[in-house]
Amino acid sequence: MTQDELKRLVGQAAADYVIQNVPEGAVIGVGTGSTANCFIDALAVVKARYRGAVSSSVATTERLKSHGIKVFDLNEVDSLQVYVDGADEIDASGAMIKGGGGALTREKIVASVADTFVCIADASKRVPVLGAFPLPIEVVPMARTAIGRRVTALGGVPVLRVTKDGAPYITDNGNEIIDVKGLQIADPRGFEAQVNAWPGVVTVGLFAERGANLCLLGTENGVETIVYSAN
């Protein structure tokens, strides 16, 4: 199967999980990116079962609305039973690197209030150690260079994310993103806490403190379900 076929496979598997485990009338937390889009497309078929969704980005909001799925602001919702999102990398503990699509801060906020985080990914995203995929850090623009120096001191190579025109990429929150190459993150929780403590960091794209509870992993043999009992 191609990577796109695997994404559609796990998107459907996540919709099936929601149907089986989330009661009718609930609001669903939805992530951002190409794999999350496959989940949205599958969820649209059964949208009448649910009140709507909480979105993690402008792009996701647009896709949800295009399917006629009502979008709630997180402030309008008391709780979320489930949050479904992709990952750029996921390790054996359920810790992830996320933010390749630029929505890491809102993804982390929505994930933090959900009872269950369901990660959907193809098998190429499963890694023994996080860090081969560049680690995104959303930063307040004036702190970009100072944070870059801190990253360099830890052995990382900071690269400012830019658009096709060469201008700094701007997040939905009005900030910039530094992508850090060359890391091997042996202690994701510790590294997440360390980077988040730097002045000017909005959030780092490590999801270890709030890792996945469940991963639906697309493989050549079908969907593999992995449960992370420690999260």
From Swiss-Prot:
<keyword id="KW-0413">Isomerase</keyword>
<dbReference type="InterPro" id="IPR037171">
    <property type="entry name" value="NagB/RpiA_transferase-like"/>
</dbReference>
<feature type="active site" description="Proton acceptor">
    <location>
        <position position="107"/>
    </location>
</feature>
<dbReference type="InterPro" id="IPR004788">
    <property type="entry name" value="Ribose5P_isomerase_type_A"/>
</dbReference>
<feature type="binding site">
    <location>
        <begin position="32"/>
        <end position="35"/>
    </location>
    <ligand>
        <name>substrate</name>
    </ligand>
</feature>
<comment type="pathway">
    <text>Carbohydrate degradation; pentose phosphate pathway; D-ribose 5-phosphate from D-ribulose 5-phosphate (non-oxidative stage): step 1/1.</text>
</comment>
<feature type="binding site">
    <location>
        <begin position="98"/>
        <end position="101"/>
    </location>
    <ligand>
        <name>substrate</name>
    </ligand>
</feature>
<comment type="similarity">
    <text>Belongs to the ribose 5-phosphate isomerase family.</text>
</comment>
<feature type="binding site">
    <location>
        <position position="125"/>
    </location>
    <ligand>
        <name>substrate</name>
    </ligand>
</feature>
<dbReference type="GO" id="GO:0009052">
    <property type="term" value="P:pentose-phosphate shunt, non-oxidative branch"/>
</dbReference>
<dbReference type="GO" id="GO:0006014">
    <property type="term" value="P:D-ribose metabolic process"/>
</dbReference>
<dbReference type="InterPro" id="IPR020672">
    <property type="entry name" value="Ribose5P_isomerase_typA_subgr"/>
</dbReference>
<comment type="subunit">
    <text>Homodimer.</text>
</comment>
<dbReference type="GO" id="GO:0004751">
    <property type="term" value="F:ribose-5-phosphate isomerase activity"/>
</dbReference>
<feature type="binding site">
    <location>
        <begin position="85"/>
        <end position="88"/>
    </location>
    <ligand>
        <name>substrate</name>
    </ligand>
</feature>
<protein>
    <recommendedName>
        <fullName>Ribose-5-phosphate isomerase A</fullName>
        <ecNumber>5.3.1.6</ecNumber>
    </recommendedName>
</protein>
<dbReference type="GO" id="GO:0005829">
    <property type="term" value="C:cytosol"/>
</dbReference>
<dbReference type="Pfam" id="PF06026">
    <property type="entry name" value="Rib_5-P_isom_A"/>
</dbReference>
<comment type="function">
    <text>Catalyzes the reversible conversion of ribose-5-phosphate to ribulose 5-phosphate.</text>
</comment>
